[in-house]
Amino acid sequence: MAAATMSWDDGKHMKVKRVQITYEDVINSIEAEYDGDTHNPHHHGTPGKKSDGVSLSPDEYITDVTGYYKTTGAEDAIAALAFKTNKTEYGPYGNKTRNQFSIHAPKDNQIAGFQGISSNVLNSIDVHFAPLPSSSSSSSSLSQANKVDAQGGKGGTSWDDGAHDHVRRVYIGQGDSGVTYVKFEYEKDDKKESREHGKKTLLGAEVFEVDPDDYITSVEVQSDRIFGQDTEVITSLIFKTSKGKFSPPFGLEGSQKYELKDKNGGKLVGFHGRVGGELLNALGAYFAPSSGRGTPSATQPPGSAQPTGSAGAKKLEAKGGNVGNPWDDGPHEGVRKVYIGQGDSGVSYVKFVYDKDSKEVPGNDHGKRTLLAPEEFLLEYPNEYITSVELNYDKIFGTEGEIITMLRFTTNKRTSPPFGLEGAKSVLLKEDGHKIVGFHGKAGADIIHQVGVHVKPISK
């Protein structure tokens, strides 16, 4: 029995922002987002196994839609769609057939909305036309932004998130050969928007969160030519912020290394790139002049963070091996939870949960989890606080530089068990009359090399 068909109409809008389709033999569903629409996204149909789509930059609009269709059973179905904008062409997404139709916007008009008929497949599609968006409707962020070319391979389908006010979170998914999936959470005009590209795997996605008073200044992109691929693919991404905070490397080392960075030292406010099949081929970025928000204090070195709880905080030097990528959670109001993961050689992973305005604030993951679940040290916050950290470190065969082998935490009430094994060297991180309110250090791909702390005077 054929599925019931339903007519739908998204109406006319200021501009199309994003189109996403899912498909198998034919298109199963279509989803669209529009500028200035409070009901985003508009979804029609049932999900298919494959997904593709396009995100338009703020100064980009659709001028043409080309469709391919076929007859399945007693009904026609759209098998593929392609989109042409004032900048480039996207698609076809789906499976091309011999039957083709095209819709072209009249002069000085754009395609600003979709309508059609759907069942469990997309049966037909039509459009609404509207005058071209005025230049003033494009984001002021975009007009000031510098677009840095995408680095990596030349293949894949282009996507462009455009420029925003801030980048708040980055999600990275990995597969056997490289980076398969990226998702970015932006802030624009005090509203949150997210864009995703590629395909998640069973491994899920790792997260890099940017503090409210911080911003990304550069991205290290590594790429390589992988067997079975026609072009280079992205194998690893590392993000750096204005506070000297580094993400762990998301992925594996590649033969080519690039840096996405603004020559004028601007803040990263958007991404663009190319994705092909199940791998990310290239990544580029938009940079805008940095405002006061997220800029390091003139009296504070760039390597130290300044979250809300930073008043009166002091940064104690990290101890351990002098290799790996720096990371810094910055000072907070207190520490609520500690998570320690161990590997064959030493401490492989740390994560700290802090307090801000009596709410839990998770820090970023540092290092890499192993099959052994992380151990947890819970504090009876706010009555309990950490006063010192004992760390052991050693040079282990096969590792680059010394690594942390053990951590032990002392509070105003008790001492934790040792997390790890004794090392050749031991050091105590402590400042008399102070409590620990944050952590920093250095980490490799799957090991912790250094740990340091932020401290604040204990209030009476």
Swiss-Prot record:
Pfam families attached to this UniProt entry:
Jacalin
Any idea which GO molecular function terms this record carries? carbohydrate binding
Q: Where is the Jacalin-type lectin domain?
A: 1-131, 145-289, 313-457
Task: Give the N-acetylalanine positions (modified residues).
Answer: 2
The region called Disordered is annotated at 34-57, 133-162, 291-334
Lineage: superkingdom? Eukaryota
Q: Where is the composition biased (Low complexity)?
A: 133-143
Q: Which InterPro entries match?
A: Jacalin-like_lectin_dom, Jacalin-like_lectin_dom_plant, Jacalin-like_lectin_dom_sf
Q: Where is the composition biased (Polar residues)?
A: 292-309
Keyword entries, A-Z: Acetylation, Lectin, Repeat
Task: Kindly give the PROSITE patterns that the UniProt entry links to this protein.
Answer: JACALIN_LECTIN (PS51752)
* Signal sequence, start to end: none
Q: What is the similarity comment for this entry?
A: Belongs to the jacalin lectin family.
Q: What is this protein called?
A: Jacalin-related lectin 36
Annotated source species: Arabidopsis thaliana
